[in-house]
Design a protein with these regions (language model features):
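Conserved hydrophobic/aromatic packing and binding residues within compact polymer-binding modules
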Residues: 11, 25-26, 41-44, 70
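Helix-turn-helix DNA-binding elements, focusing on the entry/boundary residues of the two helices
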Residues: 11, 22, 38, 53-56
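DNA major-groove recognition helix of helix-turn-helix/homeodomain DNA-binding modules
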Residues: 48, 52-69
Length: 86
């Protein structure tokens, strides 16, 4: 199964819904003590850079969205993968 980066896609969606640029999100993360710059956010949104749990929580806080909103359908995709590989 080809991996899909649901979190990156959802960060982009939630960031745009919040009316924030990548630069503004990076600035909010800096205020929270998380050093992620604009180019790193671009890589995250494109699925080119994985996230730590702390980074996911910080991004959710900066976007004022629940962590589960960022995870989206990740659990559903995982369960489908498990079923296919049993």
């Amino acid at each position: 199964m080809r991996r899909k980066n649901i979190i990156g896609q959802n960060i982009r969606k939630d960031r745009k819904n919040a009316g924030m640029t990548q630069m503004e999100l990076a600035a909010q993360l800096q205020l929270l003590g998380v050093k992620i710059d604009r180019s790193t956010i671009a890589k995250i949104e494109l699925g080119l850079r994985p996230l730590s749990d702390i980074e996911v929580i910080a991004i959710a806080r900066a976007l004022k969205t629940p962590v589960l909103s960022l995870l989206g359908e990740s659990e559903t995709l995982f369960n489908q993968w498990i079923e296919r590989n049993e």
